[in-house]
Amino acid sequence: MKDGSFPDCDILPLGKLCIDGSYMGDMGRDSGFTKEEQKTMMTLWAVFRSPLFFGGELRLTDNYTLSLVTNPEVINVNQNSEKPLFVYNKGGIAVWQTKIENCTAVAVFNLSDEENRHKLKLSDLGIENVRAVRDLWARKDIPKCENDVAVSLKPHSSEFFEIY
């Protein structure tokens, strides 16, 4: 990415997309994404600082989808972080990071169609002297993380952390 630019991921087609989707055939009114894929999409938009332009039908939005697009910790990364940095793609796992306030936000993506376990080595991210790791989607701190974070990812899923 060049300075002064950002990846514009465009609209967030999450949840129900329209009131009458009969013209869409089998897909109907639904986005066609699994819950994990919806979370991955929101994580990607957040770490890229792309505009969070919701493309779903608000009147039909389920609680899960609403929890994704209104998560204040994820929105904070989207609104207040620096330019994202691609870290690596190894064995179907892609990692991006960005600086925010007094920590580093890290997004881990499973690009494969299989479940994938990954050990996120904090030294690979240039992070030392870890005080805390926070799971942004669970909105909880992860206990006892010093040198790495073990991640178990379903197909096409992601995890999103802040590391202090």
Which residues does each PLM region occupy?
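C-terminal beta-strand-rich structural cap/linker in extracellular carbohydrate-active enzymes
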Residues: 144-164
